[in-house]
Amino acid sequence: MGNFLGIDTSNYTTSLAVYNTQDNSVVQRKLLLPVKEGEVGLRQSDAVFHHTRQLPDLFESLFSENIKLDAVAASERPTQAEGSYMPCFLSGLGVARILSAVLGVPLMRF
């Protein structure tokens, strides 16, 4: 089959992984989102900002070697429940949609 890229921009981690179906291997890169000292969590606007800053670095690291993609997948919401929504997921989903369109490969949402 080939190489499948997964993108996840949930509330606390920016994550990329490529699964190779030929040798059943996974290469991944991820960065935690910074939470200010003494704070319990992140506002969605801060999470979106940090994902936007971290995604290019992760892509540069993961794709330092030429990897041909056969499909792209991205998380789009925290749960499958109707109406489930968090803005931080739009960061990864937007990048996945762009890659799918530019590369002409299928987009899967989860």
Q: What are these model-derived regions, one by one?
A:
Residues 1-110:
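Short acidic/glycine-rich loops and adjacent helix/strand connectors
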